[in-house]
């Protein structure tokens, strides 16, 4: 039967109250008893009950124990092996964190959404659904119930978006709750004051505003806009009304302008932007006001005449005129800003509008946040002028072998198929630099078998490898580090990317590697590898019982052990994840952990650096970067101990309130204590952190408006640039530093802009930038230096099979600065150092030879020659290597009196050979030297101390030479120990005066 309709509608409309009233009496006749559908409802209710029971059972017996078991394990791990850290507090953040489904952050979103949709109850969405399902338009009370039930759940999950800013919302509330920062009633006004007050550096206020106020306002505006969109759909689809549609659209535009205005304190604005932001204010009030007026006008028109809901042509024109006028008013600040914008090429306007109001503030904020006050600037000349190290000693400290060489060489020394190499690192210990690579499990050989990956079968490797960076030889780790050669590593790293690329030919980023899988303890698989001598004897990271242990064991593929009543595990065996999983928000680890050695105790640890990464916004172009310290992970037991950065400054840091909580939540040990001196000497500034600070300083070291405008002092890394750890002399003798070379940004000439150096040891954390901008001569960059070397040694390089150039490094030599460029042969299974070049940075003078010493000799930087009319030719040669004790270093002396005057008196010629090394090595190792000469020669010798060295001086030749007379003498130098580097120089004395002094040279004793 057709339903009746009112006068306004041709057919019955479900949402017209008049249509429904006409059919209420008629519909009563067709009502029938619901008892006919009882059976259907019973089946439906029974199905729902079954589903509910199944869901509850799954939650109780699977979802909860499976999920909470991992949480429980981590809580036990960090409580017992990280100094009692509260993992629940760190993970849940007192239920602010969205890591847990039920949290207070989502609850805030649920209440905000339900309140906004209930004032008054929003019925349009339900009406749209009702149109489709034909249940009609709901009442106000029904709508209210829906929004506080289903709507509450909907907005609860949408409320998780409040924490979408990298967890900043939850973390800010946690900081406020813990009393670390204060929530001021003037917060919004203080945040906007940052824009208009050039002297305002309130980092804390901007941080709170951007992480707390902005998400809430954005969420509120988003829900209001959603509600307005529903109104638009209603007035287009259900009951057309053009006035209400355009009114809602204008209000949405106004809200978007307001939302843009809310974000302003988080942006870096110049003077022109400050003028332009008035457009957002005008737009917010103008469009909302106009939208509301049109909305109310449309309502009034509809009440007068129900057919008056479509724009007539005349009304369309009026609306367009009003909107155009409004738009012109809104963009008027943009029009006004055109004047200053066109005059930015005027230096006064640029200084006023951009330098003072934006760039100088960016520099101030960024330097404070990124910690750029750590950089001291010195002219490049200071690098050579302050060096006190002899050339011979400096040459012996050159890092001849790069990481690529070290990985391949060390990998060839692995003695089993299941072992691989973790990342190789430069380690500085006892004033000596080494390439050190811990062994690791070769995961590609065992992956896919749960017994191999998740039991004690392959739970560790034993030992590590080390190589001398100068000689390229393997070292005895027991002798050099006081660590046994088969020291077990139960907690370590995965195979390094470089190792996998060299051995397998590929690297899959994100794939599981060694130590990434959890293992169960107490199985019969321990000591299943014949070569392994150790099994894990430490405490488990955690123990699970019942269903938690059952599902955890089942999830790692060990069904046979799932039904045990007690399960003990080692988890987070990869040292990176072990430390990373206990970090509070906005902390990061350095991605390059390295080994440190307590030689007194014979213990080995991984050092994992921890630093802050706190985004502030506004004029700070880089986050707050502070090195907090390291977590030492015992490779035997997995115990973690936190050691504080020995030079961390907290007294005058304006950003301290945002990261002081990290100092309180972790149990930091004092690195400056005498008992921890061993660690301080080996501590390394985090590479990732320093590179972030370098990247910031490349730009924000410029604090002069003229240089900034010219952009002639910005820096960038050269091709193949990196942070290289080397030994150098900055004025306090040989020390361990990180070196980063930079060129001027954008210049095709690739000139050296300077070098950044990060210091360690007693000067830990001090950074120096040696600049070239005031140098009278231009210094070539590393790219040009390599090209110069290649050009000079083209013929020799062409003879090297698969020639590869290694890292280009910079050293102070011969009173100047020289680039060191090694060339390796890559043919065959192993690389070999075939050629080495030294390139002077000022005049591009090149010396090259088989190694760094030969390259230095080729430069012919001779010693002192006293002008004389004496006709004497001389030549001194010495081998640069020897093997103790059976292959001493051979030397040859050639002398000839070239005087043609037969009546001239003879020359009294004396040749001294001075051999020396440091007094510490000489005394500790009881080192002495021997000369092997013809039996009729008995060279005189004496030993003396010339700080910091102990020198033994041999008089090898002491004889008269008459006209036409000469001599050739062959001999050998030997020592009483091997594995050291000794230095020597020749002194030729004629008639009691020094005639020639050779450069200092070295002999590598193997």
Regions found by a protein language model. Give the residues of each.
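Asparagine-centered strand-capping/turn motif at beta-strand->loop junctions
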Residues: 894-900, 923
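Cys/His-rich microdomains that often coordinate metals
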Residues: 10-14, 23
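Short, hydrophobic beta-strand segments
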Residues: 944-946, 956-959, 965-977
